Amino acid sequence: MTIAVYPASFDPITNGHLDVAARASRLFDELVLAVAHRPYKKLLFTTEQRIAMIRESVAHLPNVRVDAFSSLVVEYALEIGATVLVRGLRAATDFEHEFQMAHINHHLAPTLDTVCLMADQRFTLLSSSAVREIAAYGGDVSSFVPAHIALALKQAYQTHEESRA
């Protein structure tokens, strides 16, 4: 049984992430969307909120589960018996970073391979940070994230604005 881990902050998960996850779920017996718990990083949503949003987004994919990790991703992957890390590539700049990380990860955990999936062209310019910025200014993000996440973004920024007033 091949277990693959797709790690990211997912703050929030986007349609680009979900496209990669859906395609990766067809390649491996089990896919774990691993939400990075990074207390030192300023994130819009808590780890628990991100996990809940992702679970709702991938409920239709039977071999996908969602978990959180706070260690090195290679340590987490080995701990759960994974042999593959999944990464999505949007552009050449992503490739450079992922190429370096794949080599570092392989050095740290030689039994782990990295598989990169090219982003669907509809999502090559899509990022969580761009979605957050659009949402922060009241823009429509409904074509970039599932409806429940668009609503959560709207509510998060309304709450943020109300607390600043």
Swiss-Prot record:
The keyword Phosphoprotein does not apply. Reversibly transfers an adenylyl group from ATP to 4'-phosphopantetheine, yielding dephospho-CoA (dPCoA) and pyrophosphate. This is Phosphopantetheine adenylyltransferase. Its EC number is 2.7.7.3. One of its GO terms (cellular component) is cytoplasm. ATP binds at residues 9-10, 17, 88-90, 98, 123-129. Coiled coil: none annotated. Pathway: Cofactor biosynthesis; coenzyme A biosynthesis; CoA from (R)-pantothenate: step 4/5. NCBIfam families: coaD_prev_kdtB (TIGR01510), cyt_tran_rel (TIGR00125). Its cofactor is Mg(2+). InterPro entries: Cyt_trans-like, PPAT, Rossmann-like_a/b/a_fold. The lineage of its organism: Bacteria, Bacillati, Chloroflexota, Chloroflexia, Herpetosiphonales. Homohexamer.
